[in-house]
């Protein structure tokens, strides 16, 4: 339970991370939605009978997403001063939802060896996980191009810190199975599966950083077949399947060809929500058939807060089973490394600007 709202009491049932981890808003406008089509040969999750033979009782739940998080520069100072307040005022927004997720773009280590030749390498102490939990984050993804910045030693430290913290982290593992395995939880009667993977890796590190067989590392979306297999598997016994991706081109306002190619494949395989980031700026969000896609969440807790890269916010989805009932955007601006929610006219203008980003995505304001 976090320091802001005891919403964890609404989170029922098993909270099962991969074996690696053990047990583990306010906003603007909204769009209305639909029911998604199940994979051929499978029952929709909503039709799965309960053990007693009666229909399961599901109520809508909310999940909030923030963008890229690290703890370098001024953020390390905040973290060292007090992990429980390190994310600043945005914690209240995250804590209002039943679930909250961010992209943890750093290795969790104080040791390791920096990736050779890499211009930017990020690492943070284990208190970074404390900070996320205190801010209301329920699950994070480390599948990104900084998750193994401190190579194998940093990976081992990261996995150990995750186990101790009991904060579920997807997209990373001590072997391939754990890296691709979803985090599972049940909220308001909905069985939720969250998978993390990265489509962005420096060419010279793809082999070393990708989890394969018994080798630890990150879940890579470059192995599309493997990722789609995991989505299909999750679809069979989940009411909502969420895929969190690191993808896109830095500072490019529209989704690139690789994103536009992968998103429909994930929806077809059974994903209900696909959310990602990497570009350091916001990209458009909306419906792709009956699924929901957000192509870019931008920076979130980040030391770079220029005019474009400092625009951020929290995306909150209201979901029941496979239906995304509503999307809401709580805009913020990064000040001193942390997101500060906007109010009044600035908020309304920021929401309108966020909606306008959909223009070059091929996504829709409504499902279907």
Language model segments and positions:
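Acidic, metal/ion-coordinating pockets
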Residues: 3-5, 25-26, 33-368
């Amino acid at each position: 339970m976090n320091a802001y709202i005891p919403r964890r009491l609404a989170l029922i049932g098993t909270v099962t991370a991969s074996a690696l981890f053990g047990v583990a808003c306010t906003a603007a406008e909204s769009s209305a939605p639909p029911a998604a089509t199940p994979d051929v040969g499978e029952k929709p999750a909503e039709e799965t009978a309960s053990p007693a033979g009666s229909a399961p009782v599901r109520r809508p739940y909310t999940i909030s997403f923030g963008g890229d998080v690290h703890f370098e520069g001024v953020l390390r100072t905040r973290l060292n001063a007090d992990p429980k307040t390190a994310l600043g005022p945005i914690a209240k927004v995250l804590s209002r939802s039943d679930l909250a997720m961010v992209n943890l773009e750093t290795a969790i280590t104080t040791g390791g060896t920096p990736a050779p030749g890499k211009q930017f390498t990020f690492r943070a102490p284990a208190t970074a996980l404390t900070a996320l939990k205190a801010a209301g984050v329920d699950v994070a993804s480390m599948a990104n191009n900084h998750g193994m910045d401190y190579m194998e030693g940093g990976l081992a430290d990261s996995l150990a810190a995750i186990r101790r913290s009991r904060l579920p982290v997807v997209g990373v593992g001590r072997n391939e199975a754990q890296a691709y395995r979803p985090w599972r939880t049940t909220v308001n009667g909905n069985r939720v599966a969250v998978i993390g993977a990265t489509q962005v890796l420096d060419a010279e590190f793809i082999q070393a950083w990708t989890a394969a067989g018994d080798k630890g590392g990150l879940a890579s979306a470059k192995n599309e077949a493997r990722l789609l297999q995991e989505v299909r598997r999750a679809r069979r016994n989940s009411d909502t399947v969420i895929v969190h991706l690191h993808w896109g081109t830095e500072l490019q306002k529209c989704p690139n060809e690789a994103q536009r190619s992968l998103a429909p494949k994930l929806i077809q395989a059974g994903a209900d929500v696909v959310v990602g980031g990497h570009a350091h700026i916001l990209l458009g969000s909306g419906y792709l058939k009956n699924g929901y896609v957000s192509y870019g969440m931008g920076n979130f807790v980040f030391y770079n807060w220029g005019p474009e890269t400092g625009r951020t916010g929290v995306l909150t989805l209201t979901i029941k089973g496979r239906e995304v009932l509503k999307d809401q955007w709580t805009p913020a601006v990064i000040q001193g490394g942390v997101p500060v929610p906007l109010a009044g006219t600035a908020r309304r203008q920021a929401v309108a600007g966020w909606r306008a980003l959909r223009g070059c995505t091929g996504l829709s304001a409504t499902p279907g």
